[in-house]
Regions:
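P-loop/Walker-type NTP enzyme "switch/lid" segment
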Residues: 1-35, 90, 94, 104, ...
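Active-site donor-binding loop signature of nucleotide-sugar glycosyltransferases
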Residues: 5, 140, 144, 163
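Long, well-ordered amphipathic alpha-helical subdomains in the mid-to-C-terminal portions
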Residues: 136, 141, 147-157
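C-terminal boundary of histidine-terminating zinc-finger modules
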Residues: 151-176
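Alpha-helical elements of Rossmann-like donor-binding domains used by nucleotide-donor carbohydrate transfer enzymes
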Residues: 25-28, 78, 82, 113-117, ...
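Conserved catalytic-core segment of NTP-binding enzymes
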Residues: 34-140
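Short, hydrophobic alpha-helical segments
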Residues: 178-183
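Residue-level preference for the first positions of well-ordered beta-strands
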Residues: 2, 39-41, 156
Length: 183
């Protein structure tokens, strides 16, 4: 299953504010249907609001997509703090499994510097009690590609819109990595 974020969720956060147990609504709904899927990907907006909290409460693993620039690193730190908090208070099974670099510009030096920083950070966490102690940097990355921005405007996935573009190839490699499929 893929639970994708979309514009229709805009009002959901406001509606959930007054609901008792609001941070575990998604987990309860998924538990009621867990025999219907082998795994589920939950796409969250880049925020740390109630919907993202629900996704963290319902998940076992977190894959963090990260743009390789300074401001994204600040958000990365805040997200890790939130994951740690959710792990301690709501969902003891929650772990960060990896970081996936997105919108990677192979012509610039900054993305490679950020990549090295993330690798060092994750290596330093090994053996600790934090929720990202076993996380790894995904060995492939999603290159900057205009086709990835165009596909949703046509109501299509990248695999429908342009299955041979760099973006589709990159996402295919990421899926193969997580499924353990040799390329």
């Amino acid at each position: 299953w893929l639970l994708a974020a979309n514009i229709n969720l805009v009002g959901a956060e406001t509606e959930l504010v007054s609901v008792v147990g609001r941070e575990i609504i998604l987990r309860e709904a998924m538990q009621a249907s867990q025999d219907r899927f082998d795994f589920c990907l939950i796409d969250c907006a880049p925020s740390l609001g109630l919907l993202s909290l629900n996704a963290l409460a319902a998940s076992q693993e977190v894959l963090i997509p990260l743009q390789p620039h300074f401001l994204a690193l600040q958000g990365f730190g805040k997200l890790l703090q939130t994951v740690d908090l959710v792990n301690r208070r709501i969902n003891r099974d929650l772990k960060v499994s990896g970081v996936l670099l997105c919108m990677f510009d192979t012509r610039a030096s900054l993305p490679n510097e950020v990549r090295a920083d993330i690798e060092r950070f994750l290596e330093n966490a090994r053996g600790s009690a934090c929720a990202w102690a076993d996380a790894r940097l995904v060995p492939t990355f999603i290159r900057r590609n205009i086709k990835l921005a165009e596909a949703p405007s046509y109501g299509q996935t990248i695999f429908e819109y342009d299955p041979t573009c760099n973006g589709a190839e990159d996402y295919r490699r990421v899926a193969q990595f997580f499924l353990g499929v040799e390329t």
